[in-house]
Amino acid sequence: MTRINLVPPEELMDQHLFAEFREIKMVPKSLARSIAARGVEGVLSRIPPAFTLNTGHVSFFYDKGAYLVERYALLRAELERRGINFNRESELDPDGTMLAAPWCGHYTATPEALRIIRERIAEKIALKPHWYRYEGKPII
């Protein structure tokens, strides 16, 4: 599963923060595979019009490369601030797939998208509240 959480990284539990940092890098790779299989127009025609956590979550971000670059920088900064060990050499898009049009667009999360993702995060935390940590400390 690949997740892009949309909320400010400061809101994320340590586990969600690190997982998103690791998984966000899957979007450019998935895009490259999709372009190879379907072509540019085929990929563009399948991008969902609105944020979703279901089928289409990854493809929703295919044309939002600038957003992902900004998001990746925010995730890295928050990992650094919290003192979480991560691969500082790791790049979001080493092949530059998302740097060119039509893949390099921006995105601003809608209130509805933020509501959806916050609900999902709360559901996940409720399933294992003793497992989650924030800044290295248990949340309960």
Please place each PLM-identified region on the residue numbering.
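Extended, charge-rich alpha-helical interface modules
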Residues: 1-140
